[in-house]
């Protein structure tokens, strides 16, 4: 894909990457001065990933950043003072001092979902955001990031499967920064490219140099445009390097020095500066003006953060429970939805006590003559399908369950091809006969075991 960026957009990319770099370097100094009370998870050396991917989005699109995506927050318009005060747990921070790291978002204006500490869980969440936007006809794209370590979680695969099955307008950025805390990616997965995992779900994927902001932007723009056009989800693996430890308390002594040296020579900002100069997009004066602008802005924002007060103690008792922010009429009912699905005769927010899992619980109660208790929720997968599908299809009345037909025993057996009589291709034979695969892996052991 050709580079469609204008000169102004090229300079924008530099501005946001350098703003990201200078902001985080200041926070490192504040951390060492004990002015940052929480953890500090640096994205130094990875600025091209967050900036390049988020810059490919439209204003109406949604993001869910992770701990190393400060650059995406800046591109979305979050002021540096919010990032400073958030990490310093000040009363003026987005969470009013209740969080000392990056757990904050902006749902109403900037369409930012707060990071979730449980790695991988943002994938199904943002898939749901993408599906909701499509349902409402908003033509949005939802995007989130995950690290190489987080790609080993169950939620990663569950979320991708859901996104693929629903053809959601969702983009996943896999940040392969070589290390999950102290575990190298080669000790985590048996494949060379994490993007290969997308094949299992029929998802389109890209592999790009994560330190080349133009390559990152181009891949993200192509993926976002295709998602918006209705072609389903996309996955982009960006190969980069975490140039610090997992957090500021981690000296990263487990990383080979030569590895740091290699990636330091490929610093994303220095590479981009060289690109801008060689292509005559800027000159030394333009660079100096942008750098000076960033320094002035950060001076003001940091001063505001340092002079801001800490939260009052009584604030700890507020915001613990929902106080009218979600219109729920009864403790056991679903929240009242704003819209009813088209073609559905059931009002949004119908009562569930007579359907699905609730009806099953009532049947069990009658059998064991135990008192009934209305459960507050049902499983979002199987029981959710039990509740919604038969009701909607029958116009609001639960359908009778069809009679269960016994399955003949022979249909449960997996057909096997005797070794030597099946396909000539060795890999196919091994896939159909796992025992032979083990034997081939251990030719000296006839039993196929070590």
Locate predicted features.
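N-terminal glycine-rich anion-binding loops that anchor highly charged ligand groups
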Residues: 15-31
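Cofactor-binding active-site loop characterized by glycine-rich and histidine/acidic residues
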Residues: 25-28, 35-166, 184-190, 195, ...
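Short acidic (Asp/Glu) and glycine-rich catalytic loops that position anionic groups and cofactors
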Residues: 30, 60-65, 175-176, 197-204, ...
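Short gly/pro/ser/thr-enriched loop/turn and capping motifs at secondary-structure boundaries
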Residues: 71, 178-181, 215, 242-244
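Conserved thiamine diphosphate
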Residues: 131-138, 190-222, 265-291
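A short, conserved beta-to-alpha structural element at the edge of catalytic cores
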Residues: 166-186
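Glycine/aspartate-rich loop-and-adjacent alpha/beta segment that forms the canonical ThDP
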Residues: 226-363
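Intrinsically disordered, Lys/Arg-rich low-complexity segments
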Residues: 385-449
């Amino acid at each position: 894909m050709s580079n469609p960026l204008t000169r102004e957009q090229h300079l924008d990319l530099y501005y946001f990457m350098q703003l990201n770099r200078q902001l985080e370097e200041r926070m490192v100094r504040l951390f060492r001065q004990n002015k940052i009370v929480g953890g500090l998870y640096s994205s130094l050396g990875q600025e091209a990933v967050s900036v390049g991917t988020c810059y490919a989005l439209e204003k109406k699109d949604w993001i869910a950043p992770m701990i190393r995506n400060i650059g995406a927050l800046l591109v979305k318009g979050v002021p540096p003072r919010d990032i400073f005060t958030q990490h310093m747990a000040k009363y003026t921070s987005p969470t009013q001092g209740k969080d000392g790291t990056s757990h904050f978002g902006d749902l109403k204006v900037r369409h930012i979902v707060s990071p979730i500490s449980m790695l991988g869980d943002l994938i199904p969440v943002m898939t749901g955001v993408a599906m909701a936007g499509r349902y409402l006809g908003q033509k949005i794209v939802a995007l989130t990031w995950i690290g190489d370590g987080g790609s080993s979680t169950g939620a990663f695969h569950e979320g991708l499967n859901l996104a693929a099955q629903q053809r959601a307008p969702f983009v996943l950025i896999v940040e392969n920064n070589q290390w999950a805390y102290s575990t190298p990616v080669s000790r985590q997965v048996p494949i060379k490219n994490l993007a290969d995992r997308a094949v299992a779900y029929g998802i389109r994927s890209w592999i790009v140099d994560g330190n080349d902001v133009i390559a990152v932007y181009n891949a993200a723009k192509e993926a976002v445009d295709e998602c918006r056009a209705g072609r389903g989800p996309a996955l982009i693996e960006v190969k980069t390097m975490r140039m610090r430890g997992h957090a500021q308390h981690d000296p990263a002594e487990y990383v080979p020095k030569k590895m740091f040296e290699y990636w330091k020579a490929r610093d994303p900002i220095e590479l981009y500066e060289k690109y801008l100069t060689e292509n005559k997009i800027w000159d030394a004066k333009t660079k100096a003006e942008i750098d000076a602008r960033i320094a002035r802005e950060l001076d003001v924002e940091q001063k505001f953060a340092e002079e801001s007060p800490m939260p009052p103690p009584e604030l700890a008792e507020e915001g613990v429970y929902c106080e009218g922010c979600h219109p729920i009429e009864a403790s056991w009912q679903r929240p009242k939805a704003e819209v009813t699905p088209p073609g559905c005769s059931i009002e949004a927010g119908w009562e569930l006590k007579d359907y699905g899992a609730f009806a099953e619980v009532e049947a069990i109660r009658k059998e064991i003559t135990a008192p009934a208790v209305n459960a507050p929720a049902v499983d979002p997968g199987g029981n959710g399908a039990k509740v919604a599908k038969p009701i909607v299809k029958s116009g609001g009345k639960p359908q009778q369950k069809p009679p269960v037909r016994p399955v003949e025993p022979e249909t449960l057996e997996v057909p096997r091809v005797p070794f030597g009589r099946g396909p000539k291709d060795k890999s196919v034979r091994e896939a159909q006969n796992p025992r032979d695969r083990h034997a081939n892996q251990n030719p000296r052991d006839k039993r196929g075991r070590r």
